[in-house]
Amino acid sequence: MYTSKQPFLKSKQPFSKSKQTFNKSKQPFRKSKQTFRKFKQPFRKSKQPFRRRPRIGPGDRIDYRNMSLINRFISEQGKILSRRINRLTLKQQRLITLAIKQARILSFLPFRNYENEKQFQAQSISIITGSRPRKNRHIPQLTQKYNSNRNLRNYNQNLRNNNRNLSSDC
């Protein structure tokens, strides 16, 4: 058994890479046979040019008092529509959003449109209770009622526990 340690001796020959080459496979990497084919016919434009009119005209002022303009950018539930739906530039959307918020604060606009929201809830409930049975679908009003009852129960239980603790301390 060899137990003594010998110091590491540096070899005098410089390190050289092995002469063996990496054995590459003979077949090159195959590209899929479906390549993008260039269409021989150019893209056909429609005969009548269609240009979407901008929602905000050049003379329209984006202001909280301009209710006819602001109402175009609010949904039926009273929510601010997204930029994709509005087709506005970022700057225009920002100005519209600020104008809507300002109009809401100054009570020119309601924060929510409750009449249309009730109709929307009725439609969603009729969709849920349609002919096709759906699993694990809760009607929001029922879960809200259940949660409020549970919260009330927890509140009463906490009151009882506090009263017991107070009476035991005396």
Swiss-Prot record:
It is found in: Plastid, Chloroplast. Gene3D superfamilies: Ribosomal protein S18. It comes from the Eukaryota. The lineage of its organism: Eukaryota, Viridiplantae, Streptophyta, Embryophyta, Tracheophyta. The keyword Plastid applies. NCBIfam families: S18. Its main location: plastid. Part of the 30S ribosomal subunit. Residues 27-55 have a biased composition (Basic residues). Belongs to the bacterial ribosomal protein bS18 family. This is Small ribosomal subunit protein bS18c. The gene is rps18. Residues 1-61 are annotated as: Disordered. GO terms for biological process: translation. GO terms for molecular function: small ribosomal subunit rRNA binding; structural constituent of ribosome. GO terms for cellular component: chloroplast; mitochondrial small ribosomal subunit. Keywords: Chloroplast, Plastid, Ribonucleoprotein, Ribosomal protein, RNA-binding, rRNA-binding. Residues 13-26 have a biased composition (Polar residues).
